[in-house]
Every structure is written in C-alpha cells, then in structure tokens.
Amino acid sequence: VMERLGLGPDDCKAINKKLVYGRMTGWGQTGSLSHAAGHDINYISLIGALAAIGPADRPMPPLNLVGDFGGGAMFLAMGMCAAFFEAERSGKGQVIDCAMTDGSASLMTFFFNFMAQGLYKPQRESNMLDGGAHYYNTYETSDGKFISIGSIEPQFYKELRERIGLTDKEFCLLYTSPS
C-alpha cells in the first residue's frame, strides 16, 4: 500500500538517506500468505501457540498481546532501535520488516524445544505450565473471582502446602517430566 501511495521505503529514503523505515505484517513480505489478510489469532494459531496451552478440550482465546505486541511490536521496536543506532553510526538508514508470525514463533521456542526433547506433551493440561500441575494454575474462589497459584520451586510449594493445610502425600511431590 505504501509503495502505491509513493511512500514506500525507496521513495522515503531518496529524501533522507538516514531514514529507518519500519513495517509490520502478519505473514511477512514474501511467501504464499504475504498478501493474505489476518489477525493476531491467525498468526499465533499457525505457529502453534494456541495448541500449547489452555483447556484440554479446546484452545483458549489468546491474549492479543502474544501476536500483536510480543511477536510484532516488540520485535519491530528492537529492529528499529538497532537500525537507528546503525544510521547514527554509518549515516545509512534501512528498512525493518517484521512479521508477527516470525516473532510469535520465536516466543514459542521454549515449548518447541521442550517438545523436541520429549519434556512437553502435546496434550493440553498434561504439562506443568499448561494447567496440568495443581501448583501452577488458576482456581475459582468462594466469591466467584479467581486466584492464580504459581509455586513451581520446592520452597514455595512447601510453603503453599503448609499455608493451606495440604497434607495428602499425593501432593508432596512436584511435577516430574514425562521422560
């Protein structure tokens, strides 16, 4: 669109050689989806984020923060900061292209790495960080609100058990990996 309006990176850099031109797309500048419309939910679905967490029977609606802000804006901002630094040093601007799918996929490397090692099961609610561990989850309270519990480390889990009076031996062990 910007190129059609005469405001593309080449047009603008002809006016200012130090210009840093940033643009963000969902799918990237090239490839089969480069001209397809989409939204954050589409981008993070394609890279596997919706399959990684949530209830076992369905993906949970995502926070748009993952695709739009985490996978898109933050990566674009980092690229632009590096380009500003380079433009100041060398006098040459550059074009920073950021695709939300690429940035979102990089945010998923923790899950992809653990899955590749057999340390993370593909079934939701069967892993420590996806609702499968009773000590890292959310629970409804008696007033209809929710509380989040995140007692992963042994010392915090021990304190949680002591404070709520959880003495059943079944709850004395922390999560162990499936391997």
What are these regions (language model features)?
Residues 1-79, 83-89:
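N-terminal helix-loop segment corresponding to the beta1-alpha1 unit
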Residues 38, 133-134:
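Short beta-strand-initiation
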Residues 9, 95, 136-138:
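Short, acidic/polar N-cap/turn motifs at the starts of alpha helices
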Residues 47, 72-94, 106-117, 159-167:
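Oxidoreductase and adenylate-handling cofactor-binding alpha/beta cores
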Residues 29, 57-67, 88-104, 124-131:
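Conserved Rossmann-fold dehydrogenase catalytic segment
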Residues 117-123:
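Short Pro/Gly-enriched beta-strand edge/turn motifs at strand-loop
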Residues 135-177:
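Aromatic-enriched alpha-helical interface/lid elements that frame and gate functional surfaces
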